[in-house]
């Protein structure tokens, strides 16, 4: 590395996309990265709803955390004697927040948690709501640091790693999931090389991941998504480390499109494959990946780059957002509850059925 390693990983965790001022919310506008670093102020729950809908904030954990603050801002627009009355008056705003990104699991989870908290609150319900929103953000960072330690312990000293999409501070309250493992591995001197796939069509790897790592002084090398197999064949990568949008009861994992082909390629080349996500991402009610509905986005996203069209008129495109990696191709699933190696239904049940 180009500078001495610190005794811990705090040096490698400088980016914060969500800032609560005590009066309003400031969100790093991820649509404008990496060339413009600009925060957007949200003074109402409607501002927060729009920020979620328009991708100012992205990443399932971050969306959930922001929704919690959206509920706090909504509370300023009503009067109520206790939490029960407040919940009744806040319900329309909470439903609008949920509708902004209805497929985000963390968003629904946070709003359900805020509802439970409110229903038990008394005259101090506003303060209780704000404390709960703070707790949600704080718990996210704590879980991410825990996952970072668990995941890094699996990585031999001197390893190279490849990641996909963006799973760092920009997608969470801080530190990140898969990128948190990489941060911890760098701090411990275990990781010698970091590669990031560009992640078409939104280019989260190219626009966000390598920028985020650069802010923390971590050297990263960008590759085209299509270069992954050649990179693995070269021997420069020992682990592929990715996040997850949903993990099924048998270990099958839905994640950003392109993850499945990385898992297949890794298995062929003897490269280990790690999935890192919070326990809230595990869906024990979905038995296997076949039951996951894969979201399709506008084909127009594939027909250009950064607003510049690169494809002739009249060309069709197919644009699924996620794919499903079978648990059999995953060497380790890492959550804040620990590590499941070679995951299967029995191990998942033992860890998460509570």
Curated annotation (Swiss-Prot):
Belongs to the eIF-2B alpha/beta/delta subunits family. MtnA subfamily. The active site is at 245 (proton donor). Substrate binds at residues 58-60, 101, 204, 255-256. It is an enzyme of class 5 (isomerase). InterPro entries: IF-2B-related, IF-M1Pi, IF_2B-like_C, Initiation_fac_2B_a/b/d, M1Pi_N, NagB/RpiA_transferase-like. It catalyses: 5-(methylsulfanyl)-alpha-D-ribose 1-phosphate = 5-(methylsulfanyl)-D-ribulose 1-phosphate. GO terms for molecular function: S-methyl-5-thioribose-1-phosphate isomerase activity. Catalyzes the interconversion of methylthioribose-1-phosphate (MTR-1-P) into methylthioribulose-1-phosphate (MTRu-1-P). The keyword Transport does not apply. Its EC number is 5.3.1.23. This is Methylthioribose-1-phosphate isomerase. Pathway: Amino-acid biosynthesis; L-methionine biosynthesis via salvage pathway; L-methionine from S-methyl-5-thio-alpha-D-ribose 1-phosphate: step 1/6. It holds the Pfam family IF-2B. Signal peptide: none annotated. The record marks 165 as: Transition state stabilizer. Transmembrane segments: none annotated. HAMAP family: Salvage_MtnA (MF_01678). GO terms for biological process: L-methionine salvage from methylthioadenosine.
């Amino acid at each position: 590395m180009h500078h001495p390693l610190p005794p811990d990983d705090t040096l490698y965790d400088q980016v914060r996309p969500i800032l609560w001022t005590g009066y309003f919310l400031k969100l790093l506008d991820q649509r404008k990265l990496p060339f413009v670093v600009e925060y957007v102020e949200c003074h109402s729950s409607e501002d927060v709803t729009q920020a979620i809908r328009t991708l100012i904030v992205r990443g399932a954990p971050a969306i959930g955390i922001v929704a919690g603050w959206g509920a706090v801002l909504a509370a300023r627009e009503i009067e109520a004697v206790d939490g029960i009355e407040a919940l009744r008056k806040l319900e329309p705003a909470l439903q609008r927040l949920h509708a902004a990104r209805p497929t985000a699991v963390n968003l629904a989870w946070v709003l359900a948690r805020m509802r439970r908290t409110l229903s038990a609150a008394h005259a101090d319900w506003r303060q209780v709501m704000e404390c709960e929103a703070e707790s949600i953000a704080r718990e996210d960072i704590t879980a991410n640091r825990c996952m970072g330690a668990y995941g890094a312990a699996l990585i031999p000293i001197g390893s190279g790693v490849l990641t996909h999409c963006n799973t760092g501070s920009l997608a969470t309250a801080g530190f990140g999931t898969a990128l948190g493992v990489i941060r911890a591995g760098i701090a411990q001197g275990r990781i010698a090389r970091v590669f990031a796939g560009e992640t078409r069509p939104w280019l989260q790897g190219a626009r966000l991941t390598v920028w985020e790592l650069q802010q923390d002084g971590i050297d990263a090398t960008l590759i085209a998504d299509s270069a992954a197999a050649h990179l693995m064949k070269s021997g420069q990568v020992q682990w592929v480390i990715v996040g997850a949008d949903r993990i099924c009861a048998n270990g099958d994992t839905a994640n950003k499109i392109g993850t499945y082909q990385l898992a297949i390629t890794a298995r062929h080349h003897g490269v280990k494959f790690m999935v890192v996500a919070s326990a809230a991402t595990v869906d024990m009610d979905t038995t296997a990946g076949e039951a996951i509905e894969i979201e399709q986005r506008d084909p127009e996203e594939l027909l250009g780059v950064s607003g510049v069209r690169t494809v002739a008129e009249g060309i069709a495109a197919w644009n699924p957002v996620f794919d499903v990696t079978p648990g059999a191709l995953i060497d380790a699933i890492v959550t804040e509850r620990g590590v499941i190696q070679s995951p299967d239904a029995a191990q998942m049940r033992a860890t998460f059925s509570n």
